[in-house]
UniProtKB/Swiss-Prot annotation:
Gene Ontology, cellular component aspect: cytoplasm
Protein name: Ribosomal RNA large subunit methyltransferase G
Acetylation recorded as keyword: no
Enzyme class: transferase
PANTHER family, sorted: RIBOSOMAL RNA LARGE SUBUNIT METHYLTRANSFERASE G (PTHR47816:SF5), RIBOSOMAL RNA SMALL SUBUNIT METHYLTRANSFERASE C (PTHR47816)
Keywords recorded for this protein, A-Z: Cytoplasm, Methyltransferase, rRNA processing, S-adenosyl-L-methionine, Transferase
Length: 401
């Protein structure tokens, strides 16, 4: 897949993150190109700009390539988006000193005069973003939203008008359109968080808008919760934790354990932390907090001092619009590296994904702990005889696009 981004006299080399694992998937799409092309056509000058949902920094890099001091506030929920943007700035020898990072719960500052945005897959998340923009944008601020033409319809334009201001769509170009919204300056109230009960485990769960399974247990989590391993565990990692349901239940089952919640989504980590606190899962007999929360790319920055004896994992197989198994590969490899000898990785996944093959390549063992018609639970044990890191040629994901 090409890494050469070329549009409107801007030439960049862009890779997804991590670059060495997703070489057959492109770091941008035609909607990114359309947004930059549109700015060139209207002769947009450098101004205080919010860039939202920029997957791997294509928009930020294109603006910075035009003007090194272009002031950009970058809003992302994904840690890999932040890391990918910085990776691409470095690869193109661009300074990132013009970038100010915001998470998806923070309001952009007053004085933003331009917004560039990619349409996310999650409509509830998109509405949340529009409502937050309505609280900070001055009247008549232009908001340009890039999306696939097939994703844009009358209902979407009405949704944008309802939550931010009147909107219209451009002509199609490379099967994409640019929506122009003019902020009306009327602040909208943010919706309340979704809360629901898992009565059989006496847990109360709340989700922020970009967290998977907004108001009920997903099927994979359900079978995982019913099949947690027997035994005693001191340090547990809920890898790809979402709202934290697996780690919360693990703390109930292993009350003396410390639990580390890890996710690429900042909203997921915030939801997991809120759920830990709401369910009062810290053991009062232990002197220090037992819940730890990490917004991270898998276990990249967890630290060698954390050596879990159990990792629970419900891997995603999407990254944005792309279907890919590289995230599962990285999760399995990171778990292998992080686990103490004799530690267990327990994974739930769709049968057709073939995770047992990957786990056997990495751990040299894998057993089926439970299954139903659609899902399978797999367990792999890190042998004391295995090296701390597997050979590099193990890391050979089979990509799809």
């Amino acid at each position: 897949m090409t890494t050469q981004f070329s549009v409107a006299d801007i030439e960049l080399s862009l890779s997804r993150y991590p670059a060495n694992q997703v070489s057959n998937l492109q770091a941008w799409d035609a909607a990114d190109e359309h947004l930059i092309k549109h700015l060139k056509e209207i002769e947009q000058k450098a101004d205080n700009t919010a860039v939202i949902n920029d997957s791997f920094g294509a928009l930020c890099a294109a603006l910075t390539a035009q003007a090194a001091d272009w002031p950009i506030w970058v809003e992302t929920d994904a840690k890999t988006s932040q890391l990918g943007t910085l990776q691409n700035f470095n690869a193109n020898r661009l300074s990132d000193s013009n970038l100010t990072w915001l998470n998806s719960r923070e309001l952009p500052p007053q004085g933003i005069n331009l917004v560039l945005m990619k349409l996310p897959k999650n409509l509830n998340y998109f509405i949340h973003q529009l409502q937050r923009l309505s609280q900070s944008l001055a009247p008549n601020t232009p908001v340009y939203i890039g999306a696939k033409a097939k994703s844009i319809n009358k209902a979407l334009l009405e949704t944008i008008a309802k939550h931010l201001g009147p909107a219209s769509a451009s002509l199609a170009w490379k099967k994409t359109r640019v929506i122009t919204c003019i902020a009306d300056g009327k602040p909208r109230a943010l919706p309340s968080e979704v809360s629901w009960a898992v009565k059989e485990f006496n847990l109360s769960i709340s989700n922020l808008s970009n967290v998977f399974a907004a108001n009920k247990l997903d099927i994979g989590a359900r079978i995982m919760l019913d099949n947690l391993p027997e035994g005693h565990f001191d340090t547990i990692v809920d890898l790809g934790c979402g709202n934290g349901i697996l780690g919360l239940r693990a703390k109930q089952c292993y009350p003396n354990a410390e639990v580390h919640f890890v996710d690429d989504s900042e909203m997921a980590i915030t939801s997991a932390r809120q759920n830990w606190q709401a369910n009062k899962l810290d053991n009062p007999e232990q002197a220090k907090p037992q819940g730890h929360f990490h917004w991270d790319d898998c276990l990249t920055h967890l630290g060698d001092e954390v050596k879990p004896d159990l990792v629970l994992c419900n891997p995603p197989f999407h990254q944005g619009e792309a279907i890919t198994d590289h995230i599962a590969w990285q999760m399995f490899l990171d778990a292998f590296h992080q686990l103490r000898p004799g530690g267990m990785l327990q994974v739930v996944g769709n049968r057709h994904l073939g995770y047992h093959v990957k786990l056997k390549r990495i751990f040299k063992n894998c057993e089926t702990a439970a299954s139903n018609g659609k899902f399978v639970i797999l367990r792999a044990i890190k042998s004391a005889k295995e090296p701390v890191k597997p050979a590099k040629d193990v890391n050979e994901p089979d990509h799809q696009s």
